[in-house]
Amino acid sequence: MRSISSLACLLAALVLCAARPSFAQEPPVARHARVDALFAPWTGNATPGCAVAVSRDGAVDYARGYGMASLEYGVPITPESIFHVASISKQFTAFAMGLLEQEGKLSRDDDIRKYLPELPDHGKKITLADLVHHTSGLREQFHLLNMAGWRGDDLMTVDDVLWVMARQRGLNFEPGTEWSYNNTGYTLLSVIIQRVAGKSLRAFAEERIFRPLGMRDTHFHDDHSEVVPRRASAYSPRDGGGWSISVPVFDYYGSTSLFTTVGDLLKWEANLLQPRVGGQALVDWLRTSATLKSGEATGYGAGLTLGTYQGQRTFGHNGADAGYRSSVAVYPDSRLAVAVFCNASTAVPAEFVRKVADVYLGTRPEPVKASPLSVPEAALKDLAGVYWSAVTDQVVRLELKDGALRSVGAMTPLVPVEPGLFLVGESTEEWRFPAQAARAPREVHVRDTASALPARVYTRVDAKPPSALEALAGQYHSDEVDMTFTVRVEDGKPRVRWQRQKRTVLEAVGGDRFVSDALGTVTFTRAKSGQVDGLTFGTLRARRLRAERLPAPGKARSR
């Protein structure tokens, strides 16, 4: 009887072992060499590079740097190099808010205007949780400041963000009904935390998160001029070869501006696996998907992107600002965490993270796309055209170029893999053209397969512009960004100019609707008389701002 019992126990143990993925069974030296090989293109003293760190069961197994932290001074990247990690910052801001909630000082269900009374009342309650989960409907701060005249290399501060948000008279959508990635919410959270805690987010996080976890090389960077020893500079490629310095100029934080090392970040990720700070309930909140009012899961927790890879659960985040690129992923089923920071705008650390994980999990890279399907060129041409979303007011333009369907200006083609289904390179984006009903306009449904959210629907529209372009010329003022836009017709095309920005061409996409690189979708509006009385403009993340046409000298406004 004892032998049967022992056999049963052995079989049970084998089943449990088989059910849990095991790490690659190879000597550490061989495993580390395979990791090094992944970063071969980023080695040497003439290129920026990356830092990588891998932990297993909370202990660092491997950490190394590749390439240069400073091309000017020949300083190499090491695991101790400090990087700006951009949106990886968000999980710390959400956690800090959660710590204050544990103390009863705020609630995630509070209206944000309880703490930010200077913001307008949009007629719908926006909660702190909406800020955390990207469901607030607030417009994107960076896009708004650009529309207000800030250039990409201008200093942007918390006061600038509060100024432009206080001017807004509309939302992208009703709070809780959509998910749209948004930096504004996390910058506002940093202000709320400061007002509630009585100290800056930088000081609060240092006291309550970084110091207890031994993250000695981590801080929220709230002064762009502050000298940070061991900081890696960041770069973007120059036309014709070489590199340009590309560092962000921010004094706002919460949404970004965390400075840290790969080793410090893995100390934090270990806390999300086995909490030492904050407790299990708070960590669970970070790792739980938000849901919309419709009941749909967003796939985004509190500052963490949730997903699966190689059949395992994952959580983590990516970051990108100026020339800095970063990614971290945790595989809780295997107690594995991988962090990769790079200081070149052309690096893709998320791909490195997955490839390093494959080394440790003993898995092959997941196939990203199916085999291409042969589609007649005439059929592809039939899909080309201009498509518009009534929900987001955004436009996609598809063209047939070099025998392939692609978005206008895009390098990567849409690859057909099934009838009516196209994939885009190595991304998780898919474009589906459903069968048309008789006389119905053609649609394209664009979806991120890594997300639980539904596809965005675009309908094909007539790209014919209005016959009298000169009627669009004039000046238009938007109170929401305190800016006057001048429209002129040059070389047969409308062009827009505003303070401190380059002229941008308006490309016709149907009637009074145009698109531009800087202002997104621009739609001229008309009074009952038929005369142009204003325009709306906006991007996916800052939709439908309004500008009123200013009367020409000596003329009254049309009604």
Tell me what each language-model feature is:
Residues 66-70, 123-332:
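Short, surface-exposed loop or secondary-structure junction motifs
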Residues 316-317, 327-344, 442-447, 534-536:
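Short, well-ordered beta-strand elements
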Residues 45-49, 322-325, 392, 481, ...:
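Short, small/polar residue-rich loop motifs at catalytic or cofactor-binding pockets
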Residues 8-18:
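Bacterial N-terminal signal peptides
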Residues 41-51, 72-134, 173-184, 253-256, ...:
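Short active-site loop at a secondary-structure junction
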Residues 26-85, 105-110, 163-170, 243, ...:
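Short, conserved catalytic-motif segment at the N-terminal edge
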Residues 25, 350-559:
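Peripheral terminal and inter-domain segments
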Residues 20-24:
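Sec/Tat signal peptide C-region and signal peptidase I cleavage site
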